[in-house]
Amino acid sequence: MLNFKIFILLLILFFNGKIFAYGTYSEGWANAKILQFESRGLVFESYEGIIELSTFSTDEKCDEEKDECYTITKQKIPFSVRPENGETVNLLMKSLNQDLVINYRIHRIESITLSSVTEVIQALNPLTSIPAELESDKLIVSKTGSKRNFSVSGKILRLEYQGVIIGTFEGLYLDEVRGRVHPFSVTDEKMANYAWITMKSSLKCNLGISVAFATGFRKSNYDLFEINYIAPAGGVYK
């Protein structure tokens, strides 16, 4: 009898995972262009589309010491939205070929109610001012690198929390002066949350980047230690 109950419990967990997305590999925010969006399915209806994200090629030969890395390239990614997420569906429907800020999840196992592992759970039109959610126009945390520390004028294009057992914050920033993008990590959770809020605005800001000799568990040796809307990052403050 006990074995039967365990079997039923496992069965419920299995199907619940399949229908409602069993686990999440990563979740974050990104600036995305909406290329396609439509309704699909009969039994399990969902909304499916294609977004375009900024990215780069790791094969590019460039000099990081001279801030020449990397040239911006574009990547097309299929995504899904659940039909009960009406507000997001409606905004995406009227935003074809436009840039939005999206909140997304990448699932480890594709749900039978969705046609892709990338699920958009929220979409926003970019603000034209500093987000009211921010308590200050700058945030500074401890530097983690001793190789280089510098300021970049631009904005964050993508930032997500990745991993299942050991998670890290990984992102991509745009250097508007040089017209380059570069991957970076965030080792401070408060900074990651602050960065996510700044992404809701189209305003550029100053990003403080600390470069370490080693990456540790994170994917990039570039670490974000400051976001500043009023002055270059890395200044001296009392």
Feature map (PLM): residue ranges:
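OB-fold/S1-family single-stranded nucleic acid-binding modules
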Residues: 107-135, 212-238
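OB-fold (S1/OB) nucleic-acid-binding surfaces
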Residues: 44-79, 166-186
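N-terminal post-signal-peptidase region of extra-cytosolic proteins
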Residues: 77-90, 182-200
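Intrinsic-disorder/low-complexity, polar/charged segments enriched in Ser/Thr/Lys/Arg/Asp/Glu/Gln
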Residues: 27-29, 76, 99-101, 149-151, ...
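Flexible glycine-rich surface loops and low-complexity tracts that mediate binding to linear polymers
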Residues: 93-113, 197-219
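Structural detector for short beta-strands of small beta-barrel domains
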Residues: 26-43, 147-166
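Short boundary/loop segments of OB/S1/cold-shock single-stranded nucleic-acid-binding domains
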Residues: 19-26, 132-148
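Classical Sec-dependent N-terminal signal peptides that target proteins to the secretory pathway
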Residues: 1-21
